[in-house]
């Protein structure tokens, strides 16, 4: 094991979950997922699909070329420009005819086009402001020429609140490689991943995202990717990092300032849930807000927010929460209380069934492999090895399933992961599987290593 990790004290939330009901869990029909989005205004069609703006287009975003780059929030908020528009007056009876020829797809944000103005217009004539004449479809132009009462070119002032997301991003980005900012949304929060190339305009990008997506009122980025919890930099909106969300029918309350959460792991959480049997026991070594634990307990199988989420989902009696070093947790809770013993039928008023397997979930991919060495502990006072189940008769040891997450950027990731596994545990595993969970970056993937821990290792023997 890497000695540098031995010296570190990881005060990480740990949890034990027991499953009781095989049928009482949400199905994929209740799926409500907050997914990862990547913002890129090129081509604009993809952007419009990613970000829905409940405003009328001011003009064609594809044809818009800014004359000056905006560099400050004040400039963005006070932005305005003059554009040519087409003013059209028609009779009420011809509205269906013009609608059929896409007139209402080509109107722009203007007071004359507001529902209030149209409703209060007592005349049998209606006036609309459309896009610039040369941007209108040819059939519509012909119809206007032949069937309108009047049409003319007018000058219209366009402000920041009138423009499309594509136009807004073009105002702050002075190249053609796109915005390059990934973000995921959880409740009212947008978590931005801002590369160094865009750090100078991070607050401008955050403001545009907040203004476009009205349900989000907070945008932040994590300034320390090496820590499990985040060092938050508020980029736009309110300083409110407690989000409420629904995932696969389960309700969660997450404080981003103190607890790590990743909505992109929803499929992985579902996969792990589906591996569990109703009698199984789940040991979540790095539990955070408790997503894996809540999934498991609902199927039947930051400490404060874990408890709150257990209460919200009505599984308080099935979840036991600890806040301690991960290695100490395995020894002081799992080993000393003989959780791996089939004869242990109760722990802290929580019933355990002898047929249940124990699942150890280690979702701290940066260093989780280093903690696998805790399955066999080498006492400093002697050369003797101590396993998690060396105090249990061999025939009474529960099946112990390990789900350990890691990162790898190697093309030969199987060999690289195998070397790290063998180094940490001190022996070569006879059998294991590696599942590709998700892409973290173009050169890094997240994997889940899964194996049934051999009894020899649990008994402190490295063969």
From Swiss-Prot:
Annotated keywords: Cytoplasm, Methyltransferase, Mitochondrion, Nucleus, S-adenosyl-L-methionine, Transferase, tRNA processing
EC supergroup of this enzyme: transferase
The keyword Zinc-finger belongs to this UniProt entry's keyword annotation: no
GO MF, one annotated term: tRNA (guanine(37)-N1)-methyltransferase activity
Matches recorded under PROSITE patterns: SAM_MT_TRM5_TYW2
Function: Specifically methylates the N1 position of guanosine-37 in various cytoplasmic and mitochondrial tRNAs. Methylation is not dependent on the nature of the nucleoside 5' of the target nucleoside. This is the first step in the biosynthesis of wybutosine (yW), a modified base adjacent to the anticodon of tRNAs and required for accurate decoding.
Entry's family note: Belongs to the class I-like SAM-binding methyltransferase superfamily. TRM5/TYW2 family.
Protein name (Swiss-Prot/TrEMBL): tRNA (guanine(37)-N(1))-methyltransferase
Organism: Theileria annulata
């Amino acid at each position: 094991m890497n000695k540098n990790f031995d010296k570190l004290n990881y005060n990480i939330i740990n949890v034990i979950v027991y499953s009781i009901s095989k049928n009482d869990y949400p199905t994929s029909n209740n799926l409500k997922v907050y997914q990862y989005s990547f913002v890129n205004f090129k081509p604009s069609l993809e952007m419009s699909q990613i970000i829905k703006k409940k405003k009328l287009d001011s003009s064609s975003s594809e044809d818009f070329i800014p004359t000056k780059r905006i560099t400050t929030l004040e400039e963005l908020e006070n932005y305005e420009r003059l554009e040519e528009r087409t003013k059209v007056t028609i009779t009420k009876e011809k509205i269906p005819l013009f609608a059929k020829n896409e007139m209402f797809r080509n109107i722009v944000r203007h007071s004359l086009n507001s529902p209030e103005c149209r409703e209060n217009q007592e005349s049998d004539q209606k006036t609309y402001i459309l896009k610039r004449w040369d941007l209108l479809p040819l059939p519509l132009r012909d119809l206007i020429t032949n069937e309108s009462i009047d049409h003319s070119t007018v000058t219209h002032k366009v402000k920041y609140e009138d423009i499309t997301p594509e136009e807004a991003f073009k105002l702050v980005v002075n190249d053609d490689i796109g915005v390059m900012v990934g973000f995921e949304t959880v409740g009212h929060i947008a978590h931005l991943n801002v590369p160094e190339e865009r750090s100078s305009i991070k607050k401008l990008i955050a403001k545009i995202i907040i203004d476009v997506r009205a349900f989000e009122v907070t945008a932040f980025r994590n300034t320390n990717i090496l820590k499990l919890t985040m060092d938050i930099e508020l980029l736009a909106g309110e300083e409110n990092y407690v989000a409420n969300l629904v995932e696969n029918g389960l309700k969660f309350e997450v404080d981003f300032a103190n607890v790590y959460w990743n909505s992109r792991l929803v499929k992985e959480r579902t996969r792990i849930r589906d591996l569990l049997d109703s009698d199984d026991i789940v040991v979540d070594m790095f539990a955070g807000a408790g997503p894996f634990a809540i999934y498991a307990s609902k199927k039947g199988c930051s400490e404060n927010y874990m408890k709150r989420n257990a209460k919200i989902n009505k599984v308080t009696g099935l979840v036991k929460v600890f806040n301690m070093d991960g290695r100490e947790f395995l020894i002081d809770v799992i080993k000393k209380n003989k959780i791996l013993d089939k004869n242990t039928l109760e722990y802290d008023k929580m019933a355990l069934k002898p047929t249940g397997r124990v699942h150890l979930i280690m979702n701290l991919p940066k260093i989780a492999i280093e903690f696998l060495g805790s399955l066999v502990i080498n006492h400093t006072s002697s050369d003797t090895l101590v396993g998690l189940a060396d105090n249990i008769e061999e025939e009474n040891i529960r099946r112990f399933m390990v789900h350990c997450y890691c990162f790898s950027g190697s093309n030969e990731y199987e060999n690289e992961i195998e070397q790290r596994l063998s180094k940490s545990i001190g022996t070569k595993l006879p059998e294991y599987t590696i599942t590709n969970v998700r892409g973290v970056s173009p050169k890094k993937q997240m994997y889940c290593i899964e194996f049934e821990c051999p009894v020899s290792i649990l008994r402190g023997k490295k063969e």
